[in-house]
Amino acid sequence: MHVERRWSAALLAAGLAAASLTACSASEDKVPSIGYSFDNVVNNYNARTVDGAASGARQAFTRVQVGFSYLGPDGDALSDNDIGTVAVVPGDVLTLQYTIAPAAKYSDGAPMACDDLVLAWAANSGRFATDRPLFDAASTAGYSDIASIDCVPGSKDATVVFAPGRSYQNWRALFGATDLLPAHVAARAAGVPNVVDPIVAGDDGVVSRIADFWNTGWTLTPGSVDTSLLPSAGPYRVDSYTPEDGLVLVANDAWWGIPPETQRVVIWPKGTDVPAKIADGSLDVIDQGAGAIDLGSTEGFETVTEPSRGVEQLTFATQGALAEASARRAVAACIPRTDLFDTLGHPGFEAPPAGPSSSVVDSRLMQPDTLVYPSVAATVGDRYQRSDLDRAGKELAASGNSALTVRVGYLAPDARRSQLVSRMATDCAAAGITVEDASSPEFTPSALRAGTVDAVLGGAGSLPGPTGSASSVVARYSLRTGIGLNVGGYSNGRIDSIVDQLAVTDDPERVLALATEGENILWNDMPSLPLYSEPRTTVVSDGMQDVVANPTAAGAGWNMDRWVLLK
């Protein structure tokens, strides 16, 4: 059955209704293992590195590496009180008191402690650097605003103090699911009793060893995974990972919260033969970009397609063939954005009158359902809406080129993105611009920085798979100088300042002024070209209960510990 639904709380309500049914289900009626697939690879346990953020780590481990918050279906950071509590301390400077639950511990028996928060802050703040950052963090959003963390090694309490004037608006998302990694494992790898002392002391030698492990020590290779490096502080833990049997999560016996409803979840990442797994009964939940792959027969499944918080976009290199802004504008001018939205942007559902998937997205800085979006989006006017060969030709000439070749990379296979690149190639050819499909199953956004492609098709920061949240902070920071996810290498000092200011203000007039100024700059510099809100499809087998589609970076697995499959 195919169900058409728009952005709403309908699925959440349906999930809550299902909860009442599962509460009445006897354990003997439950299938002990559930298969889950999504459209990204899983090659890292650390979702915060550049490569980890580009992988499916966040979707795979959101209920393995829990934090003080999680990303709900509406895209907001919701408190997770199983881990502990966060309280705002009164005062002129934003100060947060974190208290970890007394029973909180990892699956290897080590207690959760404020050490975990200190490691997350050090790794994601960008403050530890030589000629380059020691930690290969995807983004410093929010963490760079923290001035200090008061933590006694091994303690359950931490006081987080922000810099004056840097009251980060999205603070509830900090130290959230997949942000907190086991600091005791990093300390052991670095050969020190704890990570707190060397980080607080600024001991670059020791911090460098900690960073080396944080950067690469949690890389996952199917068939050779050392689970001793992967202790869990959530309802599930990693049991095994092989190409043949998938990534196997099992119930964490050390979990102090409500036990998971199902003892075993098997994750089948990108590259899996999904139709074959559906046919042999191995898959029960599928979360993918709409139209990305042919699922084959889905008889016995319910399908929901809806707009997501992620914005499908092209991220351009600022070197090589596209070093000149005029060259990037030439490419943007020949792309039929409105036609692409009409054919690929809202498959299976009518475009709503406003909000996500109502039309092409005309802002990189604001979500389509925010109050200021219409005014900010008006900045672009009627430019770049349809293929404009005259404009493309003039911009190409201004760049000093008579012809241009643009290699577009993305994680393959993906039928929808393949269609998009093919349409780009057709329209741009008439302007003297050759568009080549440079996708591959091994593709990573870092290829843009390496110069092996000229543009990446994906979400903000060139990310494949599920992306986005109600806050546009991470998307904005992907445009900031030096940020890991800024794989195109874009740099503009005024944009840096605007991104920083938007992160700490909630005044609508100020937000409008900043975002409007920012978009004026960005449409001229063209570091990226937003297309439309990515449509996401969630497919659920009959008998599944409590699966609530989550069209954000968290993906459908955000509440997998509540999933039940009835016989």
Residue ranges and their predicted role:
Residues 37-91, 122:
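N-terminal lobe/hinge region of extracytoplasmic solute-binding protein
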Residues 341-344, 351-354, 380, 436-444, ...:
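Extracytoplasmic/peripheral linker and loop segments enriched in polar/acidic and small residues
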Residues 540-567:
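Long beta-strand-rich cores associated with HINT superfamily self-processing modules
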Residues 241-296:
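Ligand-site clamp/hinge motif
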Residues 179-257:
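Gly/Pro-rich hinge or "lid" segments in bacterial periplasmic/extracellular proteins
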Residues 322-372, 519-527:
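Periplasmic-binding protein-like
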Residues 348-398, 412-417:
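Structural transition elements
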Residues 137-215:
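Surface-exposed binding/hinge segments that line
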